[in-house]
From Swiss-Prot:
Belongs to the major facilitator superfamily. Sugar transporter (TC 2.A.1.1) family. It is found in: Membrane. The gene is HUP2. Residues 1-29, 112-124, 169-176, 229-296, 338-355, 418-435, 480-540 are cytoplasmic. Active uptake of galactose. The keyword Cytoplasm does not apply. Keywords: Membrane, Sugar transport, Symport, Transmembrane, Transmembrane helix, Transport. This is H(+)/hexose cotransporter 2. It comes from Parachlorella kessleri.
Amino acid sequence: MAGGGPVASTTTNRASQYGYARGGLNWYIFIVALTAGSGGLLFGYDIGVTGGVTSMPEFLQKFFPSIYDRTQQPSDSKDPYCTYDDQKLQLFTSSFFLAGMFVSFFAGSVVRRWGRKPTMLIASVLFLAGAGLNAGAQDLAMLVIGRVLLGFGVGGGNNAVPLYLSECAPPKYRGGLNMMFQLAVTIGIIVAQLVNYGTQTMNNGWRLSLGLAGVPAIILLIGSLLLPETPNSLIERGHRRRGRAVLARLRRTEAVDTEFEDICAAAEESTRYTLRQSWAALFSRQYSPMLIVTSLIAMLQQLTGINAIMFYVPVLFSSFGTARHAALLNTVIIGAVNVAATFVSIFSVDKFGRRGLFLEGGIQMFIGQVVTAAVLGVELNKYGTNLPSSTAAGVLVVICVYVAAFAWSWGPLGWLVPSEIQTLETRGAGMSMAVIVNFLFSFVIGQAFLSMMCAMRWGVFLFFAGWVVIMTFFVYFCLPETKGVPVETVPTMFARHWLWGRVMGEKGRALVAADEARKAGTVAFKVESGSEDGKPASDQ
């Protein structure tokens, strides 16, 4: 979804030499991961809670009376596609992402200069303040200001938390713990949907729904005070002794010299590039494939239409005549499918590769969008706003198929792949670019979807299906497989690609030539050593 956040990807060739018991996995790592992962709950809870409260009559009556009046009209006198079309209602949803995009322009610099832990602390305070304002909102302005503060908090958290998890995780389990952030987002969504279902009949239940967003913020706030800073951040900022002590604490052993040396070497390399230099490198011809692919994946992730579904699915079902409690229950079912499918991604991403999941997910999402459009186009023309329960159940099943496809493909991979193709030179700017573009298009979709549905009717689902076709072809023809690719070989991987090699021009050809020379030297060494595998030949 807007779901997720940047994932730091670091490849260490000596990781197999660290020799930690159980690969470095221990109870302390679990506590660190669970506490820091509450940053994902912040994001997920906000995504999940928004659509539910906008379908609650008390909320609409207080802040959006014109929409409330439309919902009370007889079913045969209202247009099911336009009942909730209102720019102010869409601003309530989308202002969150506009604020997150603004923060992302400088969040990378704050994370690098101040550290991951202080950034998480600031993010949790901002989110807590936003939750408080929303819970106590007396008018639309107060509501939107609260949403902006929530966006500031998530914008900072999405830049810091995944990086924190990655740098604390043992190398052997780094990929799995990185994906845990996306899992936390999906859990946050379903928790919010369950809260909405429970508060729908309460007096001012929407206040409780919005206010409970403060719970994960409090967890992250306490965790930010108690958890250690990451070894990488401490070492980058010149605190090597403290960095080694934290590393030993995380690994539950003093035998951390090899990993400590690797972190020091990586930190030394990364500090060679300021954030300004990182942005300059990203926009150079040599790294233009990373810029284009990162930006397109971030944009296309939102053009799947997932956030339109997650934000507005209760509104969608309510518009088609489903009872409010049933509409909210449908969101819980969709949220459960979202969580289950994310587990599929965690366990299959390193088995089937990134391209395989992208392609399968694209085909499945396309089918889901087209079938949804066809069913609504036929059935709404026949029944208006009183869809039969069997038809509503069929739409729910198709949406679940679509959401599952997203959750094991474009959801987590939309963040993972951009992180894997960033070199040391471009990492800071590249991941900021991913967040900025993602939040920008989340804002656009959030602000436009209800108006698009009113204007395009069932065709809005074909609009997103068309984009799914484009992104699937993009993956097939333009995206190299990044599974297991060391970060230092990423530019060469793009230089060998049929399209990106042309984009990189002379720089790309030079990289390929250097790689061929290196390989030729390795082969020559193996031949001279008397063995094809590079080991000394045995005496006969």
